[in-house]
Amino acid sequence: MHPIKSESAVNTTEQMGVPGPWYDRLPHFKMGFKPSAGKELQSEYFVPVEHAYEAIIALESLQAFISPYLFISEIRTIKADDLWLSPQYRQTTVAFHFTWKQDSEAVMTLLPLIEEKLEPFHPRPHWGKLFTMSPKVLQYRYERLEDFKQLIQRYDPTGKFRNDFLAQNLYSTT
């Protein structure tokens, strides 16, 4: 079954408890096929799992605003880890994933509303997906960020591997 009802299941992996190798079960879509709906936008936020219920209720209050722009959403849990810049650093989280229709203006208007609703639960956004959280707030959420910056300075002192995203989100104080 395809998570988006209007799409064919031909490009999806077998699901619903069917045993198989991890590479055929963890992803929703088969290698070499169009993922999801094709042209789309994505965002994802992680909150400590103990706040799952309250976060779900908070997001549900935005349903009327979110639904017109949403292809699919997913809620999942992820075990804590020890990776400094992981949203799961020392905390098991619940993730709220959104696959949006390709309407950048609408999505970028919705994200601050979602972030505001999740704020009491100290959300951490997915680094590789859309978010509007300020660099100051983002930096505060990652307690080992300063240690990471020291590693960057040690191993990349000239900034060869830095880009605008890192400059804005890791080094900006706004």
Give residue spans per PLM region:
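Noncatalytic alpha-helical scaffold of FAD-dependent oxidoreductases
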Residues: 1-174
